[in-house]
């Protein structure tokens, strides 16, 4: 046995890019993408991606370079998930909801060489590049045109997306990874403009999470997948590559619209879709909501869906699955594996069970909850709190240019520390209770409390500020800012609160702006003078939901 070693035949680098060429062979005439009046087959998609990769290479993009994309869920965004890494480059999909200031920071931090930008977001990118310091060469921009969108531009482009596709070589030999540990994707997670956190994943981890997600969700061949989840969120939880593996049809939509979703689900017999709990709420509350002709599998993550929302969506024919994941693990790595006997329970009992994040998926080796002081496993009693830790093949390589933060997250004991607080129930199912890291999840978007607080503190009238999550039945959570101001609370407190909200709107993306501002004489502190956020969270929780009418 000792003589049997790895060799070139059995140690070829794993990469999900091979799914595309297989799809072209096995599912060549099957529809791969539908977007308005545009439709492609898997054979056409493979050809287009090869041509695009060829043209990208001709622009001087080489192995290890970063290519960024700012676009919604359109065919170009999907194709770039293959075409960019086919050149050996690293794909960086940027959240379209960010402002120009933050995008400029990410482009500089990642040393992006080339940016594909949808024409709707062109003004945003132009503004972002003007913020580059003198002497810093901004990246080359490639315009993604769309006949469905009207927008004017005075920018003179040397390259457009479709021109690159047409000019490329369909027989291009794509650049295979030299090692399966070669970087493939870069995704920025919560962080500040001064310290962005860029999560880098290898071809290996993306291969593993993709196969893992398909198996865990029991995705069969030829699914019809509706893109309600932004592809810039952890690359659409890996289903961008997963649909090629199973010959699925990608139904693309530029912007989430409830009426359009209902129409597309019926028109194309959609079988699968993903999204934050807020999407479930919007679908089930829509006046256009009607009983589905066929069941639709819906995978959601983040805050668990409220019982009322779960009941409404299930009554329409959606089969809701709940999971837990993080950018550092490339997607959903814990899921609430459903047991048949649970179907006989009441709606409230089912919702209580489904609120639990669940058990590890097969692509993760171990998930545990450990005491934050001793590092020992906590009791399996559903009560003892600890930090959620995990290990497995889909864990990130690390944070770009930040070895210190990487070592704080991936520690010498071999575990990735998530910063999330949870419990393990007696049946082994995990339930997230809180977060060590101060992050609010609002409508599926991560809101870093520290960054919001830094903006609130910029207001000359603010003395103290603390931002916490206020539970919301529609958005899951919304930012709630507690502040003390110079001169103390005055009779016109409503005006003070409105002024702070407006102040933040001018300096933050809309989803990060506090929806609630509470002016206090003084924020509660402990004996060391630290603001007691635990007390503030309780106050925010007692306020109830802003969206009470949405339920």
Regions inferred by a protein language model and the residue ranges of each:
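Conserved AMP-binding/adenylate-forming core of the ANL superfamily
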Residues: 8-12, 17, 29-74, 78-82, ...
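Gly/Ser/Thr-rich phosphate-binding loop
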Residues: 162, 245, 270-275, 284-352, ...
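Conserved AMP-binding/adenylation subdomain of ANL enzymes
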Residues: 207-224, 232-272, 282, 286-287
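Conserved beta-loop-beta connector loops within the AMP-binding
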Residues: 360-389, 408-409, 426-427, 490-497, ...
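Conserved AMP-binding A3 loop
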Residues: 41-43, 184-209
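Conserved pre-ATP/AMP-binding loop-to-beta segment of ANL
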Residues: 11, 28-31, 142-143, 148, ...
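AMP-binding/adenylate-forming catalytic core of the ANL superfamily
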Residues: 98, 115-117, 273, 392, ...
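Structural core segment of the AMP-binding/adenylate-forming
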Residues: 19, 58-59, 82, 86-166, ...
């Amino acid at each position: 046995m000792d003589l049997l070693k790895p060799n070139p035949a059995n140690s070829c680098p794993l990469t999900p890019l091979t799914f595309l060429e297989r799809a072209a062979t096995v599912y060549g005439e099957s529809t791969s993408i539908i977007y308005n009046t545009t439709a492609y087959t898997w054979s056409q998609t493979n050809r287009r991606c090869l041509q695009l990769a060829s043209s990208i290479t001709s622009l001087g993009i080489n192995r290890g370079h970063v290519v960024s994309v700012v676009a919604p869920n359109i065919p170009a965004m999907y194709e770039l998930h293959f075409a960019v890494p086919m050149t050996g480059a690293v794909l960086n999909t940027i959240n379209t909801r960010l402002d120009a200031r933050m995008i400029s920071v990410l482009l500089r931090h990642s040393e992006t060489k080339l940016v594909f930008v949808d024409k709707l977001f062109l003004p945003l990118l132009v503004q972002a590049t003007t913020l580059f310091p003198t002497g810093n060469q901004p990246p080359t921009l490639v315009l993604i045109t769309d006949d469905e969108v009207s927008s004017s531009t005075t920018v003179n482009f040397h390259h457009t997306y479709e021109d690159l596709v047409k000019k490329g070589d369909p027989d291009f030999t794509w650049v295979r990874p030299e090692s399966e540990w070669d970087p493939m994707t870069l995704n920025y997670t919560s962080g500040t403009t001064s310290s962005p956190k860029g999560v880098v994943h290898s071809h290996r981890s993306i291969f593993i999470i993709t196969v893992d997600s398909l198996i865990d969700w029991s995705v069969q061949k030829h699914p019809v997948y509706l893109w309600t989840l932004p592809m810039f969120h952890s690359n659409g939880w890996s289903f961008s590559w997963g649909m090629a593996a199973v010959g699925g049809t990608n139904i693309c939509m530029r912007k989430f619209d409830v009426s359009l979703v209902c129409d597309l689900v019926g028109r194309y017999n959609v079988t699968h879709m993903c999204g934050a709990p807020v999407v479930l709420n919007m679908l089930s509350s829509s006046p256009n909501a009607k009983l589905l002709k066929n069941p639709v599998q819906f995978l959601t993550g983040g805050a668990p869906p409220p019982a009322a929302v779960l009941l409404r969506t299930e009554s329409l024919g959606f089969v809701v699955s709940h999971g837990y994941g993080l950018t550092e693990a490339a997607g959903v790595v814990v899921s609430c594996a459903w047991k048949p006997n649970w179907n006989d329970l009441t709606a409230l009992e089912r919702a209580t069970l489904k609120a639990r994040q669940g058990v590890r998926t097969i692509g993760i080796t171990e998930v545990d909850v450990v005491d934050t002081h001793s590092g020992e496993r906590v009791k399996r009693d559903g009560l003892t709190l600890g930090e959620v830790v995990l290990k497995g093949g889909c864990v990130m390589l690390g944070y770009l240019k930040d070895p210190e933060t990487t070592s704080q997250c991936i520690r010498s004991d071999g575990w990735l520390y998530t910063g999330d607080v949870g419990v393990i129930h007696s049946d082994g199912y995990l339930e997230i209770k809180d977060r060590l890291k101060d992050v609010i999840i609002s409508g599926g978007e991560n809101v870093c409390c520290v960054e919001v607080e830094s903006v609130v503190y910029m207001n000359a009238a603010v003395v103290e500020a603390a931002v916490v999550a206020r539970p919301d039945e529609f958005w899951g959570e919304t930012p709630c800012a507690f502040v003390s101001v110079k001169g103390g609370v005055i009779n016109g407190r409503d005006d003070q609160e409105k002024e702070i909200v407006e102040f933040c709107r001018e300096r933050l993306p809309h989803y990060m702006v506090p929806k609630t501002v509470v002016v206090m004489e003084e924020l509660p502190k402990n004996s060391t003078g630290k603001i007691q956020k635990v007390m503030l969270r309780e106050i925010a929780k007692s306020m109830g939901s802003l969206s009470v009418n949405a339920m």
